[in-house]
Amino acid sequence: MAKNFLIELGTEELPPKALRSLAEAFAANFEAGLKAAGLAHQGIKWYATPRRLALKIAELDEGQADKIVEKRGPAIASAFDADGNPTKAAQGWARGNGITVEQAERLKTDKGEWLLHKEEVKGQPVKGLVVELAAKALAGLPIPKAMRWGNSDIQFIRPVKTLTILLGDELIEGTILGVASTRTIRGHRFMGESEFTIDSADQYPAILEERGKVMADYDARKAIILAGAKKAAEAVGGIADLEDELVEEVTSLVEWPVVLTAKFEQEFLNVPSEALVYTMKGDQKYFPVYDQEKNLLPNFIFVTNIESKEPRHIIEGNEKVVRPRLADAEFFFNTDRKRPLIDRLPELEQAIFQKQLGTIKDKTDRITELAGYIAEQIGADVEKSQRAGLLAKCDLMTSMVFEFTDTQGVMGMHYATHDGEDAQVALALYEQYMPRFAGDDLPSTDVSASVAMADKLDTLVGIFGIGQAPKGSDPFALRRAALGILRIIVEKGYNLDLVDLVAKAQSLFGDKLTNANVDTDVIDFMLGRFRAWYQDEGFSVDIIQAVLARRPTKPADFDQRVKAVSHFRELDAAESLAAANKRVGNILAKFDGELAQEIDLALLQEDAEKVLAEKVEILAEALEPVFIAGNYQEALSRLAELREPVDAFFDGVMVMADDEALKLNRLTLLNKLRNLFLDIADISLLQK
């Protein structure tokens, strides 16, 4: 009879940013173990709080089913000698299976005959399996850094305090991570019962909520926080900033969420909202509140882990905590504005960008020139782009950014605006870091885009230029930088070539770079970013590979090619022409001679090769302006017309003819055919 199963691991406070991933991995690992063991169930649900990880499995089988295991022995030919007596190989195999050779059955197949032993294996009861399965599931958790506690050598992400394993109402005895299974479960630190006993898996998680004042259901806690925060924001006439990453973190910090609203002095709103929000969200884990026009209100929402009869005291305590941080931001803002941003430029000489690549002032000089070069290529204002490049890193020397590091860029924008800099220049100081993550907004102006690309390109070329390409870790965020450049070029439709950009960036480093292949390495790295990006966009790997095989170094051009090949693949002729291109490629690869530049029409003998040659010549001329215009979809649609003449050619023409002149001419025809497709992509790489 199937029963509900529970395992709860009580711990010290788990890392909040890792809590969901730990719980999900625990469930996935345990479920995989159950499947491998042949144990059926009706669903698994994970629970997670700061002080526990738990799984509840509905209707878990009480044991494995019995099964017949077939063990094949030696082939009959080697199991018996010429006189029909068992060989040592046969006897050893039989002895290992606890039988005699005479007791073995025989297995006959089309490939031969073997000795066979069928053994009935009794299924094990689930209670004898789950402890080991749970231990393996926990051992497989994504723990970046484990810790030891006490005098034990046992390691886990945090010290383990309790373990409860129940199958129905039966306690499963066992020890995991040095802790023996009992019926004791710990409640909330400050409310309810600090610990109590649980009689049955069926009682979980309700008993924990009723007696322990702990809401074990992670998603339920999150829902309470979201609903409570929205309601609280509406009560003060605003909208809560409920960024999912912060909501997840707060959910992982509390076992009994209570949503409260607090306020701060109106005068602090004179400080740029980004600085206030940084300290509220980053330091205090508060949710800021905005009005309908997205202006920050003097209120914030927070979540406490205790239900108090006097919530006013908790609110006042949080207001008291945040006030000095906001006062610091106000002080830094007022102090920083006493000096123009440009006056901080010489101070960048004191800040090292990278030991071999120089100071941030050196980087600023390179960004300034590179931004001007890019601006010229895309039609942006060169003077504004260079001015923005010159000011780009000056805010790193301000008190505000030194204290609140995540405000870099945005504070530069505010200080530049205060100094009377051009609006586009000021905006570029903020937008130089865009896109900051997958799906983030792009720089909104061409000036901003010039500076953003210059900054990222300088970092890429510099770090690759000293031989520090990312492997596992990526301390300079080169993958993000490469993808950012590609997104800006593709999504804004800039006609930029990576070869030119990298060459210009490389030239600005003088003799600082030691990697002679930096240009190739950077471009290959950037093209590699296309693969992950376009896969995420829904394009299949073979389509992406078909285009990358041509190594297109203009990102906007790559985008057009991928979309054209994707469209081509849906055509009826695609599969046949892909196979034909693969065949042509194989034929040409085996030929080590020199092909002619043009087809000799006088040497064409078979009707099929005459038709194909004529079609190829016509298309080659007709498609030349289409290729130049980059209209690859139209080109591939026209090339699809080659399906029938290509099929007829391979059906009726011997390519590798005995006559050398005929063979060379036919190979030249096939080469010209293949090059028409290779002008766009290597479609031979397309899969069925």
From Swiss-Prot:
The keyword Phosphoprotein does not apply. It catalyses: tRNA(Gly) + glycine + ATP = glycyl-tRNA(Gly) + AMP + diphosphate. It is found in: Cytoplasm. GO terms for molecular function: arginine-tRNA ligase activity; ATP binding; glycine-tRNA ligase activity. GO terms for biological process: arginyl-tRNA aminoacylation; glycyl-tRNA aminoacylation. Keywords: Aminoacyl-tRNA synthetase, ATP-binding, Cytoplasm, Ligase, Nucleotide-binding, Protein biosynthesis. It comes from the Bacteria. One of its GO terms (cellular component) is cytosol. NCBIfam families: glyS (TIGR00211). This is Glycine--tRNA ligase beta subunit. The gene is glyS.
